[in-house]
A protein has these predicted regions:
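Bacterial N-terminal signal peptides that target proteins for export
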Residues: 1-8
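Charged, low-complexity C-terminal accessory regions
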Residues: 22-27, 52-76, 199-235
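A short, well-structured beta->alpha microelement
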Residues: 101-121
Length: 235
């Protein structure tokens, strides 16, 4: 019963994040330090990936097996502090990630629009990848400027040996031509990948993780991200 209540709580938090995602100004909340996170719009579809049936992809997760990790493991020992959460693409997913990290009591800084110079001050960066045209508009950022920012962050991570976790939590609505530009940047520098499996129905994320030889955790739903996040960042 407690587990069921916890899942319901996470779902409610994520739902609220969709309608009131992101904030501006500096604000400390829970275990996180809130910094100049852009106001996020509701999730908007950038084009859905092909279905699993047509792509030949076989889903690993199910209602009975909600979290599946492949290509080895990524453990708490792999995390170095301080930790930053940021977005590339400015989707509402970064606010849902923020809500989940608060739920597990993680110690981190949240800044949805962090610059490459900001990123250089951290040892671990969790990137919520996938684009939202509404989110970009709300943040007053053009697609071109956001791509330049994303590439600069990726280069900084490489140059400074920063551990990168790519978190793709928006499912099929964070796929398509625009979103995949940001997804590819995150995958290119990721040491670990978390993906809601609906967004991997063409095998994009599993293929990239296999090619790079990095662990990937497939999630049946966004609420299931609480499991790996607790294992990695829980007190």
């Amino acid at each position: 019963m407690k587990k069921f209540a916890s899942v319901i709580s996470v779902l409610l938090i994520c739902s609220m994040a969709l309608t009131a995602c992101g904030s501006s100004g500096d604000k400390s909340t829970g275990g996180s330090t809130q910094q100049s996170g852009a106001s996020q719009g509701a999730a908007s579809s950038q084009g859905a990936a092909s279905t699993g049936d047509s792509s030949g992809y076989t889903f690993r997760t199910s209602a009975d097996n909600k979290v599946v990790t492949e290509n080895g493991t990524f453990t708490k020992d792999s995390i170095e502090y301080p930790v930053l959460i940021t977005s590339i693409g400015q989707s509402a997913d970064v606010s849902m990630l923020d809500a989940l990290m608060k739920k597990v009591g993680a110690d981190y800084t949240f800044n949805a629009t962090a610059s490459a110079d900001d990123v250089a001050n951290y040892k671990t960066v969790i990137i919520a990848c996938g684009a939202s045209s509404k989110g970009l508009g709300a943040a007053g950022i053009s697609q071109e400027d956001e791509l330049a920012r994303a590439n600069a962050i990726a280069q900084t991570a490489k140059d400074n040996g920063i551990t990168v976790i790519a978190a793709h939590l928006g499912g099929a609505s964070r796929r398509g031509a625009l979103s995949d530009q940001f997804n590819d940047i995150a995958l290119g520098v990721a040491n670990y990948v978390m993906v809601v499996e609906e967004g991997n129905d063409d095998g994009k994320f599993t293929d990239a993780a296999t090619d790079k030889g990095v662990p990937i955790t497939l999630l049946h739903s966004i609420a299931d991200a609480i499991t790996p996040l607790t294992e990695l960042f829980g007190a």
